[in-house]
Amino acid sequence: MVELSEIPGDPNGADPNNNPQEEDEENLPILLQLPEELIERIIAHFPQCYSPSPILVCETFRQVINSDHFYYVTRSLLSFTKPVLYALIAFQAYTRPSWFFLRQSNIALQLHRIRSYEPVQGLWESWGEESELMRFWHSVSSCVVGDLLYALDLTCALEHPIVVYYPNEFVWRPVMGVDTAHLPILCEYRSTLANFDGKLVILGGGDCSESSSEIWCVEIALETRQGDQIWGVVKSVSIVSRDLPMRHVIELCRTVMV
């Protein structure tokens, strides 16, 4: 079972209710006669989302967890990193959005021309609005998996809700094996597509009505069949939140290894 949990604080990660001085007074100091390397190995077993708990043990634990070396070196060398899906969700216009992460447990829009840099020739190339690439490519409902660009198209223009762009042929094709019968009723402008450990994840609102507060999560595994045809297999469909305020919009959804 998966659920969407809010991360305390503002979008920049600060916790306005956190007072380190009060924490020091509330927690008794503990003297640990352990090498720092051993402490790192012990704490590395804790998932990143639970790091606030070990921090409260003592100052030594806090220093280890807050160090860049711990998360970027120690956890990677010990193969304890894992993908975590984060989403930035806004609830009303002109209000500050909040960060959420997916945990396993019981302004007016303007059109802008997209420019891309070709590193071999060292040239800038403009992708016009009428180009085939721009047909389904949207920043929120698109993502890259295995060097291929995938997009969510709930209008099913190619008869399937997920499409993939083949750069060598400059053409979009449907992801076979996934159709609307496998998905909940989703609202396109409230749904996002993300790469989660090599799989596609759709995170989206249940419908387009203002009274809807549900967020669905659909996990889809990808595989190649019959040459280069991409197929999808729906692994799970679940409601990850029922408690969000109405009229929420998912502004960003990305996976981070922690």
From Swiss-Prot:
Stored InterPro entries: F-box-like_dom_sf, F-box/kelch-repeat_ARATH, F-box_dom, Kelch-typ_b-propeller
Top-level lineage group: Eukaryota
Pfam families: F-box, Kelch_FKB95
Region of interest called Disordered, as start-end residue ranges on this chain: 1-25
Comp. bias regions, Low complexity: 8-20
Span of domain F-box: 28-74
PANTHER family xref list: F-BOX DOMAIN-CONTAINING PROTEIN, F-BOX/KELCH-REPEAT PROTEIN SKIP4
Protein name as it appears in the record: Probable F-box protein At2g29610
Protein species of origin: Arabidopsis thaliana (Mouse-ear cress)
